[in-house]
Amino acid sequence: MIRILARGLAYLHNFCFRACNRVLMYGYLQKFRSAGEHVLFSPLGSVLSYSTITLGHHVFIANRAWFSGEIEIGSYVMFGPNVTILGGDHEFKDITQPMFFVKDNQQRQAKIKIGNDVWVGANVTILKGVEIGQGAIIAAGSVVNKSVEPFSIVGGVPAKKIAERFTQAEKQAYISHSHHWSK
């Protein structure tokens, strides 16, 4: 009996959480600098600096995302759970005060750009100034501190190139068929 009740409560909790997330998502979409069509994300479980983020069409951001800074995300982009994107860092060379009290300034910020058709795996951290090229894949658990070439598969800490997603001929065919990315 207790098991049945526990399962029922778990189902009810999941249903309510998902329903609240959907309702809130539509309200929070207006807070982004701009957002394309068919954007899905979880406002209840994420921390996003909405006013500095630009989203393309068909973007999926899984639970527990932390996006901070000037971020431009293309179309057809998927983010796994627990992805962190940090567009800045803290000043640590001010000898007049502890790091705790030093406020972020513009010199410590750098825009992050993520191209079209990118897949970012779970638990990935992307640091300031990085540009991720079209068609790239970032393996789960990676820390991306340098730009990623188009159609590359990268992974590790720090992220390094593992493989190419396509051969040169496949890249050309892909590019000739990707005219709909801007729609």
Name each model-derived stretch.
Residues 81, 140, 150:
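Residues that flank catalytic or metal-binding motifs in active/ligand-binding sites
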Residues 90, 142-143, 149:
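Flexible glycine-rich beta->alpha loop in the catalytic core of nucleotide-sugar glycosyltransferases
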Residues 131, 147:
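Residues immediately N-terminal to the Walker A/P-loop in ABC ATPase nucleotide-binding domains
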Residues 127, 143-145, 153, 161:
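Conserved hydrophobic/aromatic beta-strand scaffold that supports enzyme active sites
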Residues 45-55, 60-130, 157, 165-166, ...:
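Flexible, glycine/small-residue-enriched loop-and-beta-strand segment within the central core
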Residues 1-31, 36-38, 76, 89-95, ...:
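Terminal amphipathic alpha-helical/low-complexity segments used for targeting or macromolecular assembly
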Residues 40-42:
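Conserved beta-hairpin
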